[in-house]
C-alpha cells in the first residue's frame, strides 16, 4: 500500500510540474502575441503616415505653385 501511495504521489507531482510548465509557456506566448500585435499596429500607423505625407506635400506644393 505504501508503494502505491508513493507512486500516486509521484504521478501527481510530475503532472503538476508539467501543467505548471505548460501554463508558463502559454503566458509567454500570449505576451509575445501582444507585443507582436502592438508592433504591427505601430507599423501600420507609420505606413499610413508615409502614404499621407507625400500626398500632403504635393497638395501644399500645388497650392503654393498656383499662388505664385
Swiss-Prot record:
One of its GO terms (cellular component) is extracellular region. Its main location: secreted. GO terms for biological process: defense response. It is found in: Secreted. Expressed by the skin glands. Residues 23-51, 68 form a propeptide. Disulfide bonds: none annotated. Keywords: Amidation, Amphibian defense peptide, Secreted, Signal. Residues 1-22 form the signal peptide. The modification Leucine amide is found at residue 64. InterPro entries: Frog_antimicrobial_propeptide (IPR004275). Residues 30-42 have a biased composition (Acidic residues). Belongs to the frog skin active peptide (FSAP) family. Brevinin subfamily. This is Preprofallaxidin-5. It comes from Litoria fallax.
